Swiss-Prot record:
Residues 36-62 form a propeptide. The modification 4-hydroxyproline is found at residues 28, 30, 32. A lipid is attached at residue 35 (GPI-anchor amidated serine). Proteoglycan that seems to be implicated in diverse developmental roles such as differentiation, cell-cell recognition, embryogenesis and programmed cell death. The gene is AGP40. The keyword Nucleotidyltransferase does not apply. Its main location: membrane. This is Arabinogalactan protein 40. Belongs to the AG-peptide AGP family.
Length: 62
């Protein structure tokens, strides 16, 4: 049972990391004009959410 919990936690962490890395892939160049800081901060917020969810899941499965 312990190995199953570890496997599930690692699997979900890997899924979260891959989803965050997919969100940070190259995008087309921004158009000239007003730029938004939220587009720059989105990958950071995504990685924080993924780390928080994986930590919660690890505590839940402990």
């Amino acid at each position: 049972m312990e190995m199953k919990n570890i496997f599930v936690a690692l699997f979900i962490s890997a899924v979260l990391v891959s989803s965050v890395s997919a969100a940070t892939m190259e995008s087309p160049a921004p158009s000239p004009g007003a730029s938004s800081a939220s587009t720059v901060a989105f990958p950071v917020v995504g990685s924080i959410v993924a780390a928080s969810l994986s930590a919660f899941l690890a505590l839940l499965l402990q």
